[in-house]
Regions:
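Anionic group-transfer/hydrolysis microenvironments
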Residues: 7-9
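Non-catalytic C-terminal interaction segments of nucleic acid-processing enzymes
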Residues: 47-110
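Short, charged, amphipathic alpha-helix that recurs within catalytic cores of restriction-modification
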Residues: 11-52
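Active-site beta-strand-loop-beta-strand hairpin of nuclease catalytic cores
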Residues: 1-5
Length: 110
């Protein structure tokens, strides 16, 4: 009955910019926050990333190429589990409908 937010970051500049946001991932319905980043990005900037993510979790993604040259990501694993926020507000039925609608709008408008 809660949301889990996953922020996808593909480079260190995008990752750093996330911490300059005025409202840093503090929506009341979000119980856990994860960053999903390429494994090689993490290995290159491990100390900085570990220091900044605080209670957020970390999902590492490996970049793979298939036989046709198509690049895709494969989850390497949960490097760190997110600490649940104690003040998170459970979703109401209206909230669930709202988020489902938002998700559908993102696909329909492509």
């Amino acid at each position: 009955n809660y949301l889990t937010e996953v922020e996808i970051k593909i480079d260190i500049y995008d990752f750093r910019a996330d911490f300059k946001k005025e409202n840093y991932h503090n929506h009341p319905n979000v119980r856990q926050l994860y960053y999903a980043i390429p494994t090689d990005l993490y290995l290159k900037h491990k100390d900085e990333i570990d220091e900044r993510i605080d209670n957020a979790g970390l999902i590492l993604i490996d970049e793979l190429m298939d036989y046709n040259g198509i690049i895709y990501g494969k989850v390497n694993g949960f490097h760190k589990k997110a600490k649940p926020r104690k003040n998170a507000v459970p979703l109401t039925e209206d909230d669930k409908f709202h988020y489902l609608k938002l998700g559908c709008m993102k696909w329909v408008n492509r």
